[in-house]
């Protein structure tokens, strides 16, 4: 599996934490880290997602996590279905718009954001953006001529 860097949210003075991979493969669960081959663990993360135009969406989601690489792996299909369910109730006109998972937020800030006591600007100030966003290409097993 090869690693490719993708576009990254430029957060200025924001705290940078974790690396992130949005897994587009339905049939690949990444039970092992695609970089270091260590077994991944399941952990809940509070993801901050920017939805065009200028909308923040907070998602409490179980993701695969490699502690060695500090890599969070989230399945794209699961993220999109959870976003669709949430946005259909709060803001249905932006469903299907482009989005970018930009970072994580602490649980106390997530609760305050969902309760409506934090503005989007305050959430951005308190969140941790990803250090890097990775892409991995899955190469199916088999014989390949050299």
What is each model feature region?
Residues 86-146:
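Long, contiguous alpha-helical scaffold regions
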Residues 39-43, 75-76:
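Short, non-ligating residues that shape and space the ligands of small metal-coordination modules
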Residues 33-37, 66-69:
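Short cysteine-rich clusters marking metal-coordination/redox-active sites
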Residues 59-85:
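Short metal-binding segments enriched for Cys and/or His
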Residues 8-22, 44-55:
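Short Cys/His-rich Zn2+-coordinating modules
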Residues 25-30, 45, 59-65:
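Short metal-coordination and nucleic-acid-contact micro-motifs, chiefly zinc-binding Cys/His arrays
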Residues 47-57, 81-92:
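Short cysteine/histidine-rich metal-coordination sites, predominantly Zn2+-binding motifs
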Residues 1-9:
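A boundary/linker detector
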């Amino acid at each position: 599996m090869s690693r490719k860097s993708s576009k990254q949210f430029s957060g200025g003075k924001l705290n940078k934490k974790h690396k992130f991979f949005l897994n587009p493969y339905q049939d690949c669960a990444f039970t092992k880290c695609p970089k270091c081959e260590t077994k991944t663990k399941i952990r809940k993360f509070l993801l901050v997602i920017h939805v065009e135009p200028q909308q923040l969406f907070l998602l409490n989601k179980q993701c695969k996590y490699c502690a060695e690489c500090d890599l969070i792996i989230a399945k794209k299909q699961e993220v999109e279905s959870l976003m669709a369910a949430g946005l259909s109730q709060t803001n249905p006109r932006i469903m299907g718009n482009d989005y970018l998972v930009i970072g994580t937020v602490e649980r106390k800030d997530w609760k305050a954001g969902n309760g409506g006591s934090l503005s989007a600007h305050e959430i951005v100030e308190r969140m941790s953006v990803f250090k890097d966003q990775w892409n991995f290409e899955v190469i199916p097993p088999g014989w390949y001529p050299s």
